UniProtKB/Swiss-Prot annotation:
Protein name, entry field: Methylenetetrahydrofolate dehydrogenase [NAD(+)]
Source species: Saccharomyces cerevisiae (strain ATCC 204508 / S288c)
EC number: 1.5.1.15
The family this protein is said to belong to: Belongs to the tetrahydrofolate dehydrogenase/cyclohydrolase family.
Single GO molecular function: methylenetetrahydrofolate dehydrogenase (NADP+) activity
Gene assigned in the entry: MTD1
InterPro entries assigned to the protein according to its UniProt record, in alphabetical order: Aminoacid_DH-like_N_sf, m-THF_DH_NAD-bd, NAD(P)-bd_dom_sf, THF_DH/CycHdrlase, THF_DH/CycHdrlase_cat_dom, THF_DH/CycHdrlase_NAD-bd_dom
Length: 320
């Protein structure tokens, strides 16, 4: 590239949603004695990243008119009971849990303990099923919008902000012709992100330590939802081939030692890092046209947006 690429801060993207969120909270307050919706966060670990996320969530939500209650659970064995109690508390509008807690399948179980009506993170199995099947509503009348997991949704919104989505195409096909690579296939972010992008029309290379897969909706988007094809076991050669074919490189490797090779980046590509550590080297902008080093502030904006959507869904359900 003739000149270095630009850095796009997450705060700049998040700002585009702030006015909408604040206005909706103010409307809510008019019918709820001047009080904003209540978000309850559960912290049952000593993870510094989780504590930082909790601090960011509280600061951002309260600045926008929400009420926020961080409940620290000293004995993690009592977390499930605390979540169930919040599920049944009509004063609570949204619930989130700062993971990891147990760091195993028990965490996946806890994700399902949060009732879907209050699941601001979009981790409930109903929401995941809708995501993977490209279903965008909870009801046949298309009134109750399904909830998407916060970080994958944040990355979609970043791509929209960067005009990677083509608004001239029909909704649901606006990534047609784009190729993306996602270096992470976790059940929380990587896999659902690959599915979301493919369901919107992209060809997505999904990378983990074992293999590389391709997510697409088939030739000319003939399929209603994404299809997964195994490309082979992980190798540097296959990674390089897929990456150099990609217009967008998205990384989420939770390791300070990991750096995505700059020489694998296609000239003019867009690079986005959603890990809490830097996954790209300092020379990334020698190849990338646009570089987003962190996504956290957009993730929190999507969490609050999800919460307002849940509040709206509850209100619409009562009208039936």
């Amino acid at each position: 590239m003739s000149k270095p690429g630009r850095t796009i801060l997450a705060s700049k993207v998040a700002e585009t949603f702030n006015t909408e969120i604040i206005n909706n909270v103010e409307e809510y307050k008019k019918t709820h004695n001047g009080q904003g919706p209540l978000l309850v966060g559960f912290l049952a670990n000593n993870d510094p990243a989780a504590k930082m996320y909790a601090t960011w969530t509280q600061k951002t939500s309260e600045s926008m008119g929400f009420r926020y209650d961080l409940r620290v659970i000293e004995d993690k064995d009592f977390l499930e009971e605390a979540i169930i109690q919040a599920n049944g508390d009509d004063s609570v509008n949204g619930i989130m849990v700062y993971f990891p807690v147990f760091g195993n399948a028990q965490d996946q179980y806890l994700q399902q303990v949060v009732c879907k009506e209050k699941d601001v993170e979009g981790l409930n199995h109903v929401y995941y099923q809708n995501l993977y099947h490209n279903v965008r509503y909870l009801d046949k009348e298309n009134r109750l919008k399904s909830i998407l997991p916060c970080t994958p949704l944040a990355i979609v919104k970043i791509l929209e902000f960067l005009k990677i989505y083509n608004n001239l195409l029909p909704e649901g096909n606006r990534l047609y012709g784009k190729k993306c690579i996602v270096i992470n296939r976790s059940e929380i972010v990587g896999r659902p992100l690959a599915a979301l992008l493919a369901n919107d029309g992209a060809t997505v290379y999904s990378v983990d330590v074992n293999n590389i897969q391709k997510f697409t909706r088939g030739e000319s988007l003939k399929l209603n939802k994404h299809h997964v094809e195994d490309l082979g076991e992980y190798s540097e050669d296959l990674l390089k081939k897929c990456s150099l074919d990609s217009d967008v490189v998205i990384t989420g490797v939770p390791s300070e030692n990991y750096k995505f090779p700059t020489e694998y980046i296609k000239e003019g590509a867009v690079c986005i890092n959603f890990a809490c550590t830097k996954n790209f080297s300092d020379d990334v902008k020698e190849k990338a046209s646009l570089y987003v080093p962190m996504t956290g502030k957009v993730t929190i904006a999507m969490l609050l947006r999800n919460m307002l959507r849940l509040v709206r869904n509850v209100e619409l359900s009562k009208e039936k």
